[in-house]
Amino acid sequence: METCNGLMRKNKRQKVSRNSDWSKLCPDVLRKIYETLRSPVDSHRAKIVCSNWYSVWKTCVKRPLCPLRIIHQGDSPTVGDGNRKLMGFSYNSYCMASSGNWLLMVDRCLKFYIYNLLTKERIDLPSMESKIRGGQVSFKSKSNNYNFGYLVGPSRKDDIVPYDYEAVEWKKSLAVLWVDETTGDYAVAWTFMRQYLFSYIKGDYSWCNLNHNGKSLVLFDMACENNKLYLLTMDHHIKIFNFYGDFLTGEQNLYPFNFVEDPSEYVWKRKIVIRRSGEVLIVLSLKKKVQNEEKLLFYIFKMNLESRKWERVYCIGDEMLIFGRGVTALALEDLDDGIKSNSIYFVGEDVWPDHQEHEHRVSNCGFFDIATSKIEWPKKIYCFINQNQWFVGGVAY
């Protein structure tokens, strides 16, 4: 039998256990825990434990900044060492774009949806085969073959554009996604064959055709941020669409981006990038011959509001630029595995494919140090979804 003193000690321990709240750890202890987490997934899971943990997370200076490489492997069960297999995706789905923790996915029959990589929430968008606002075009799929279809243009009989879901050209279509993590608002835009532009905003009943008067709109690139869609057109102008409820208003930059290449410079890609401040940048991926040697380079330009001319930018401060996403993110200090400020993150397809630099890389993702103009190819943890873009979890920006 337990003694009187033993019972008293047991009751005291039970009382202490009932009164202590394990989630209310000392803020200093929680900050130390957060600073040891390198993965955006682990950081996200920790911050949503309870309101107290989330409040402390917001005060952390060293929040994990860890861009992850996104690769699509279909239904393949094999994953290399150090790689992470993401569940919930099949061979039929393809990732078109990302924003924070969200991915823009498309299935056969042009079925679009957005998917939260961390919470697994899925939001289905209207079918592209349903009626499209702005009219004049429609999508049709071939019966009994969901890989093939066609777009019917304004002239109907003479304006039919076929597509193959598995074609490389199809998977290189421009697409952007913007999600406001606070309000839940979102906007999507994508181009069919880089000529027909469509958009969808939360609350719309259908997709909207942005090709006015049936004219094709050929683009170099586009970006979407804070309810604005930025287009870099083939005539080197920037066109901006503002999303306001059911209305779309457009404005055009009257000062085109005219970059004249030197005989030693060869541009591979042109990218429009929106900084955290809202400033618009244009980034060029190119190669340049220097003393009989070719170097892979990135040039950054911004508009001088006084001279109305585009000027080179040689520093982006404490930010890092995600080339595939067309945005910058805050990098408070240099982290391991090549994660550092004043750098441009890219994938193999973003630079010239015939360059000798590709022979020395240890992965298909790299970063360009703006200060030194040097490229490194760090070996990283990969997320298997899409082979041509970085995924940057929305945990620190």
Swiss-Prot record:
Parts forming coiled coils: none
Pfam family for this entry, one: Beta-prop_KIB1-4
Domain F-box, chain residue ranges per copy: 20-68
InterPro entries linked: F-box_BR-signaling, KIB1-4_b-propeller
Domain of life: Eukaryota
Name of the protein in question: Putative F-box protein At2g04810
Lineage: Eukaryota, Viridiplantae, Streptophyta, Embryophyta, Tracheophyta
